[in-house]
Amino acid sequence: MKRFALFPLLVLLLMITPVQAQQNAQQFGDYVIHYNAVNTDFLTPEVARNYGIQRSKNRVLVTVSVLRGEMGVAGKPVAAKVSAHTANLTDQTKNLSMREVRDGEAIYYIDTFSVTNEETMDIFVTATPVDGGPRMSIKFRKQFFTK
């Protein structure tokens, strides 16, 4: 049962169009970083409880995964050292403590942070595959709505 507890979260995060999926991924040689950020009130209470995530309109879940392979083709999940931080438009920053979550062969890195209504955040992620892959850095911007 616990093995499939993350499945509803993954379905939610993957319910995006192919164009959005390409916008939420970046290729670095033999590796692809997939990333997303969503308000935690999208999570079911069970998923939030299982992963110690507070459900709230004012909290955002950042998810990152690193795959070995080509963008648009199913790749092999790779463990990585992942760090991240956020910055709002007034340059207030917060370091995230990305924690690893494994579900079968899938490997994800997650953390949450607080936002206010209509706040735009820059999210900076650095990932280094433990199998010797390159250090990869991405930045994405997203506006969050809490009302």
Where are the model-predicted features located?
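Short amphipathic beta-strand segments in non-cytosolic proteins
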Residues: 83-95
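Aromatic sugar-binding surface patches on proteins
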Residues: 103-110
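Beta-strand-rich domain onsets/edges
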Residues: 22-61
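Short, aromatic- and glycine-rich surface loops/edge beta-strands on solvent-exposed regions
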Residues: 121-128
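Beta-strand-rich structural segments
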Residues: 60-70
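Short acidic/polar inter-strand loop motif in beta-rich domains
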Residues: 129-136
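Bacterial N-terminal signal peptides
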Residues: 5-16
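Sec/Tat signal peptide C-region and signal peptidase I cleavage site
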Residues: 17-21
